[in-house]
Amino acid sequence: MPEKKIYKGIVVSNQEIADGIMKMKLSAPEAAGEARPGQFANLYPAADSLILPRPISICDADGDDGTLTFVYAVVGAGTAEFAGYESGDTVRVSSPLGTGFLLPSPAGAESVPALGSLNAVLIGGGGGCAPMLVAAKEL
């Protein structure tokens, strides 16, 4: 099992996309390069906060530009704190966690062997839809 690491992320954008639903994009090149579809990361509140880290599904990961995108509902003190972050703010983010989805792999990658032509149906509801974007991109 890979060792969990904590990285420094920089908020690129953080916007409300629906009532009480936020989309935060972080520049965190090391974490973005490690992310796989279906994983999550712990986001850590400010150092002086008494709030515990929040596990949030990775909605998108772009290893080329070094960004991770998270979509989350503002439901308590922790996510309310995150909703107040602005571009340029620092956020501590864990390395991607969880097994993730088993997807057919591109040639040479270590995952499920490539299956050739494949049709897939992705099903998610509510917050469960967030990791489907990165899975769809991978397929």
List the model feature ranges, each with a label:
Residues 2-89:
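Ferredoxin-reductase
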